[in-house]
């Protein structure tokens, strides 16, 4: 493995996560935040600061449109995941991290 690939892998070992929660997804947000704390993954403060965009719950049409605009502002490598149930949290985060590492390749 070359130096650049190692640096990319290291940088994405703890991806910065930006959460977008739909109305009535508070419990789901708590589940995701608890899992992020357990993993030691930081929350992003803006699209420019994120690697992994996670949409919680089912956004309505207006929020979905806003999420698309937000997504367009996230730089590569990036990954967008949707979480509908607390049981999906770990799988979504693991899949997102794996996809980021592949894309950074």
What does each of the following model-derived ranges do?
Residues 1-8:
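Short N-terminal or domain-adjacent regulatory/targeting segments
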Residues 8-105:
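Cofactor-cradling patches in redox/metallo enzymes
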